[in-house]
């Protein structure tokens, strides 16, 4: 897992300095990391969590060791292989109008807690179109493939919700890369249709949608949603916060619980 934030411009404030470039995360740069020398990643998720204090963004690399036997053997362990792939992507991202750094195990646990946003699996009541819990409602939607653009991704952040979690999934396919996106809203009340009218319901798959945004793979069937091919000339970007990702304010779920 990689944490990404806007780069700090050392020349900021200098006289006659040109306006600094907007900090962004180019999806094409992330997608290129799906194929790295002898390593083939199954997918990469770009996960963002927007709250009132700010926005945190992470990049999650996913790899099937059975498809990378030679690479794992050459490095003696699965952990070393995935760490090498992560470091390569960090190198490609860091300094290009953004800061990138790999997370340690404790930080991944904090990320997991931040994305759950206080959800306790024991207190969730699943409904067909939303999840109910003591603090309100959690509702997930999938984005129509043609709508996966930079402008639409920016519009997914709603100011009247407690937290917005957007997951952009990049998956390697024969001959190309597929992109899909889901969004999750935490709110006090059920969301009116005027808010989500351009999105698609995940009927009966609300728990699976929450699992799909977490860094640690969950047991059970993966969430399958519609995707499209990512064009080689597409310049979709994710706008970044100009500061380091905010520290999570939520506590991890009790040990032994899972969604």
Per-region residue spans from a language model:
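Charged, elongated alpha-helical coiled-coil/linker "stalk" segments that transmit conformational signals
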Residues: 25, 39-42, 74
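Membrane-proximal, solvent-exposed terminal domains/tails of membrane-associated proteins
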Residues: 60-259
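N-terminal topogenic membrane-targeting module
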Residues: 1-31, 35, 50-52
